[in-house]
Curated annotation (Swiss-Prot):
EC code: 6.3.2.8
Annotated positions binding ATP: G122, T123, H124, G125, K126, T127, T128
One GO molecular-function entry: ATP binding
Organism in which the protein naturally occurs: Nocardioides sp. (strain ATCC BAA-499 / JS614)
GO biological process entries: cell division; cell wall organization; peptidoglycan biosynthetic process; regulation of cell shape
Keyword hit for Nucleotide-binding: yes
UniProt name for this protein: UDP-N-acetylmuramate--L-alanine ligase
Recorded catalytic activity of this chain's protein: UDP-N-acetyl-alpha-D-muramate + L-alanine + ATP = UDP-N-acetyl-alpha-D-muramoyl-L-alanine + ADP + phosphate + H(+)
Keywords, comma-separated and alphabetical: ATP-binding, Cell cycle, Cell division, Cell shape, Cell wall biogenesis/degradation, Cytoplasm, Ligase, Nucleotide-binding, Peptidoglycan synthesis
Compartments where located: Cytoplasm
Protein family: Belongs to the MurCDEF family.
Length: 446
């Protein structure tokens, strides 16, 4: 369910008692964590228990398992994620009571109020770049508040309240959320057509980034990765309009001489350079920022090492767009060395697979062995014409090196049957495929 953002969003300390529907998700849990740190009364509900819910309880949140209208009594504001359906009993009850109901983006804007916001946007690389900028600023002596779409390995959390005036935030373009943040500065990693179920056309999608850049403070700045045509064009347009614009390129990595990053891959190098440039524009010393980049050990589900068993290394990543798939397979190839890359890919959303399924399959051709799962539906309805078979059929590898496995519980065994000592197994996708890696390790250990 997508809710409109109110024309005026109150600061978080004026929202009263806040209840999150879907509090365990990556987006809402971080906002809840920041509100709790500010002394705001927080409650929430989710369908299943998790370590995230345990952590929020320990911070003082009242968390319910399951959804019930009774959970929103004595609540002033309801915050919902896009995964919440219109018939959710808590949402229905909040509307009946006339409570303030906010989408995730408005709740994030509420906790940003009064801070100097650096918003990180782009089709790919938002989470990694936001993470890199956060650790770089911390190393340089800043203590920013941050909200990221994944858990930082160094802290184990996806958000934290800082003592400084900076707020580093991942800015999601999928539903237009990033148009409501009014940041001081922004980083744009790339612009490539995606979320066309929301935007309709590639042109409308790209135009949203222009509108986003127009929301920056007059004395703020824009950092763009010039390796990407869309981001480079955005930089040129806004430089011509008088905006302070900085461009970076992975082809000019001299600023990071002597810095060993946590993962190979040109896209990760570009992310690090963008973070460095933003930190310098904020007034911090490049050497201090680079020290932070060198200390970065990753973010959950971004080329995350899950373990090794039977001589097989297992990694997991969130990549679900063709460009992201290609980038992470490049990185996996570098990590694998002389070993082969065996990938399990779970297409994400019927709407995305319908548009990009063939391109996904072509990108997967950079692996040595490919297992394609069925489409992870999330909030969408199935379409018998759009399944994982569409992706598998487009992989440019011999048939014996590609498998479409619709039975989720059979995927781990299929990967183990294909992997050999020295190989790297990589699970890719934004859905439940992340659970496959531990199963593979368990089978290899057994």
């Amino acid at each position: 369910m997508r809710l409109p953002v109110p024309d005026q969003v109150l600061p978080a300390d004026r929202l009263g008692r806040v209840h999150f529907v879907g509090i365990g998700g990556a987006g809402l849990s971080g906002i809840a964590r920041i509100m709790l740190a500010r002394g705001i009364t927080v409650s929430g509900s989710d369908g299943t228990d998790s370590p995230t819910l345990t952590a929020l309880r320990e911070l003082g949140a009242r968390v319910h398992l399951g959804h019930d209208a009774a959970h929103v009594h004595d609540v002033d504001t309801l915050v919902v994620s896009t995964a919440v359906r219109e018939d959710n009993p808590e949402y229905v009850e909040a509307v009946r009571q006339g409570l303030r109901v906010l989408p995730r983006s408005a709740a994030l804007a509420a906790v940003m109020a009064g801070r100097r916001v650096v918003a990180v946007a782009g089709t790919h690389g938002k989470t990694t770049t936001t993470s890199l900028l956060t650790v770089a600023l911390q190393a340089a002596g800043a203590d920013p508040t941050y909200a990221i779409g994944g858990d930082l390995a160094a802290t184990g959390v996806n958000a934290a309240e800082g003592t400084g005036d900076l707020f580093v935030a991942e800015a999601d373009e999928s539903d237009g959320a990033f148009l409501h943040y009014s940041p001081y500065a922004a980083v744009v990693t790339n612009i490539e057509a995606d979320h066309l179920d929301q935007w309709g056309t590639p042109e409308a999608y790209a135009a949203a980034f222009d509108e986003f850049a127009d929301t920056l403070a007059p004395d703020g700045f824009l950092v763009c990765v010039a390796d990407d045509p869309g981001a480079a064009a955005l930089a040129e347009r806004h430089r011509a309009a008088g905006r302070r614009v900085v461009t970076v390129s992975a082809r000019d990595a001299g600023a990071l001489d002597g810095v060993t990053l946590w993962s190979p891959g040109e896209h990760y190098l570009a992310d690090a350079l963008a973070a460095l440039a933003a930190g310098v524009e904020l007034g911090y010393a490049a050497a201090d920022l680079a020290r932070g980049l060198a200390s970065y050990t990753g973010t959950k589900r971004r080329m995350e090492r899950k373990g090794e068993a039977g001589g097989v290394r297992v990694y997991d990543s969130y990549a679900h767009h063709p460009t992201e798939i290609a980038g992470d397979l490049q990185a996996a190839r570098a990590v694998a060395g002389s070993g082969r890359v065996v990938v399990a890919f779970q297409p994400h959303l019927v709407s995305r697979t319908r548009i990009f399924g063939t391109a996904m399959g072509r990108a997967l051709g950079a692996a040595d062995e490919v297992v394609v799962l069925d489409v992870y539906l999330a909030r969408e309805d199935p379409d018998p014409e759009v399944t994982g078979a569409l992706v598998a059929g487009a992989v440019p590898l011999p048939a014996e090196r590609v498998a479409y496995v619709a039975d989720f519980d059979a995927v781990a065994a299929e990967l183990v049957a294909r992997a050999r000592p020295g190989d790297l197994v990589l699970t890719l996708g934004a859905g439940t495929v992340t659970a496959i890696g531990p199963r593979v390790l368990g089978l290899l250990d057994g």
